């Protein structure tokens, strides 16, 4: 309350009137005027940049949920990941989608970055069935035993850059839609190249030899909403690998209509009139 006195105004408590607030602090009268601020600038370029940040952040969280992320740089690993993601298609999702963990499976998206030689892989066929054919050399035919493949003999014996103690890591990425929100889930499996641990640990993919190269065969490869990546790991070092996928669910999110719908969910763009998608 404010009270009139002979020597001025006595203020006790807090007085608010319109956009003016008056209160005391340490024996002094503080007056503050509240003014309305313009909403944060959201030009087209700024909005695309912020969408990119949200895209990278959610996909990074999905990768981390599968295990430790193999990106060089230690504390700067996320920055390196974001740098590699610049090559990926721009996708636009609404505020609600990103707030609820929305993610999209992108062809070639990075899962690792390091100094070890990359593993090459591409789509192929084995006896009429779909396969992922890699650049990893193996003996032909590929020897199998009841518990799996002798990984040490198959990989280390034919590839000079593979050593006992290395691991072959398989990432499986699955694109789903939950409550109208697209989400990517990542599963990681590892096979250790050690004489006493020669079990083939990739449950859904069977190893085959194709012209002296390791190929992976399995019914799940026909699923167009999945993606795979193989990574060579040695302690804290790894190869640089991206995702092989036929998934196209991301494509509608790359359009101008998707951009405008996403922008509308954030309050629209500044610096240009907003047009409702589909209307002139």
Residue ranges and their predicted role:
Residues 76-278:
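Charged linear interaction tracts used for macromolecular binding and regulation
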């Amino acid at each position: 309350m404010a009270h009139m006195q002979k020597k001025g105004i006595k203020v006790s408590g807090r007085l608010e009137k319109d956009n003016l607030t008056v209160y005391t602090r340490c024996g002094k009268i503080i007056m503050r005027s509240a003014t309305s601020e313009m909403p944060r600038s959201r030009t087209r370029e700024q909005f695309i940049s912020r969408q990119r940040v949200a895209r990278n952040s959610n996909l990074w969280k999905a990768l981390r949920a599968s295990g430790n992320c193999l990106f060089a740089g230690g504390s700067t690993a996320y920055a390196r990941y974001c740098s590699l993601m610049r090559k990926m298609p721009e996708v636009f999702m609404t505020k609600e989608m990103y707030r609820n963990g929305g993610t999209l499976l992108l062809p070639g998206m990075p899962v690792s970055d390091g100094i070890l030689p990359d593993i090459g892989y591409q789509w192929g066929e084995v006896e009429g069935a779909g396969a992922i054919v890699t650049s990893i050399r193996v003996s032909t035919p590929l020897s199998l035993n009841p518990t799996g493949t002798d990984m040490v003999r198959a990989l280390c014996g034919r590839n000079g850059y593979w050593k006992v103690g290395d691991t072959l890591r398989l990432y499986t990425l699955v694109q789903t839609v939950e409550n109208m929100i697209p989400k990517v889930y990542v599963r990681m499996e590892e096979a250790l190249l050690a004489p006493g641990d020669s079990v083939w640990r990739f449950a859904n993919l069977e190893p085959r030899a194709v012209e002296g190269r390791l190929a992976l065969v399995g019914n799940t490869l026909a699923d167009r909403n999945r993606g795979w990546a193989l990574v060579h790991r040695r302690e804290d070092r790894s190869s640089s690998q991206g995702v092989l996928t036929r998934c196209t669910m991301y494509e509608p999110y790359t359009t101008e209509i998707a951009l405008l719908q996403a922008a509308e969910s954030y309050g629209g763009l500044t610096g240009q009139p907003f047009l409702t998608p589909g209307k002139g």
